[in-house]
């Protein structure tokens, strides 16, 4: 129960909610299922809160297990005092447990170990007691390992240095002082390794550890790893020495030297490693959280349904790869054209005619242009062609990860006859039609909507991003008859094998026409059906409930509800009746929870609703904008492509995304850009600064008269 109380205090949830979540999880329920279909039991906890409870429970269990191991080992040594036992039991972090365990930990033989084995501990005690004529006293401790007085005193020194360096109280004091008062610094180590001067602001950098921002920590780590920067610390050494000296009754030159060695050779390097690790962990957590939030918004971008799209994968020498897909994402044709240099004039003219032919033949409505190599030149080419073709627009699509997908086993299986580049063009087109369905085919780490994602723990990053994808897929729901195995595998209760079995079943038996039929899929057992059924939509079913998010376990309640309200079919009259019900009393009548009833009614009122329709759709363009066309103070519309700790990057129709620095986001103080903007948002911006030489533009969310 003590563990539950800690979780409750930290997360602001009740003991009952914690018990419910952990019990349901132990029974095999998934986070999406608990969040959607067990709201009454959890008192409306969402996916993030449920995951936080599960994660903290695992963390506290691991901490308790480690404490148990450490206590047992120290007790075996016969050195477990009541005070030490209490300190370990009260420790709130694994790092604190390890600090307390350090003096008793088995370690490789050190100079201090050898000195203790040679019987020099009493000599070390004499140093602490300010023994007069220490050199004469040391003569009694000479041995084969320590044949001279100087050697013996040096050995005693080693014992004291290690003892002080491993003293838990002194280590904690040093740690707290460093946290409050020390600076982390960086200087230029090798300029030749930073030709573009990416790390220029860190060539002569210092910041209080207490004020260190996550993205700066990761920048220092990367610069150090690349050999560009040398990272160090500035400590209040004199202040620390005074604290250490206060611990000793005696004071002499020997003790001063012992303290100096313990602090500078042992304690500070150890604390620096700990601080660097902690700063990195905090920075990684922040970067992962930001990447996850960006990914969530990217996956929720409104799909452009029912449009014929031409995917345009730009390239210089090898030509642009085109792919036309119909309203359902089915590939109609692929082609290669040579629209930009080094192509000859005749090739470029032929490319124009071929693009116009494809647009007319397949009634293309939108062209999706990948934002990679040759994107700028390809955009200009497309814009020129569209002057001659009415009612067609283009969109610049973030193609990050498209090449990863196109070379994957999934893409090879889907389009075995096509080249990698043509598969990539199909992926770019489909990303516009249904971003979620297409992006789930790609490792989320390859999508590129974060900062320093390659510098953080890849295991933690994958876990966090997978959670985001799972959450969004289940919140949106999946058409079981059109979904790819990649999309199905993110549905609660389903795995790779079951997802592939569903697709195979469709291929062999035809369309699935009811949720009950799902049970016939091989390896899809009762628990998997319970977890997955509500998230799987079947538009072809005669039972309209199968087309909604209503779970089959609630079908009897819906039938009873319709009987009580006199509803025979879902028409306007039925909708009016549903809107007027008293949720609490009706839920009691139906013997279900009020939250469950609210969700049922919401699904009945909007059976085909798509969560993503409430989010912004991509901006369609028909003409290209050049950096030279921009003017300070000019008002533009744009789409947020990426959010980072220091601002947001916005696509305003020029080759490079413009940066809105955090200082240009609000007249009020904000801690983070995500308080104001999200990936996929449509924003009105004003040009704040133009750098033609570096081809950079700075933007502002504040109108010129508001900007500071």
List each language-model region with its residue ranges.
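Accessory alpha-helical DNA-binding modules that contact the DNA backbone or grooves
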Residues: 30-31, 42, 46-147, 475-614, ...
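Low-complexity, acidic/Ser/Thr- and charged residue-rich accessory regions of DNA metabolism proteins
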Residues: 139-149, 208, 227, 244-263, ...
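A glycine-rich phosphate-binding loop feature that marks nucleotide/adenosyl-phosphate handling sites
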Residues: 176-184, 312-316, 373-377, 397-404, ...
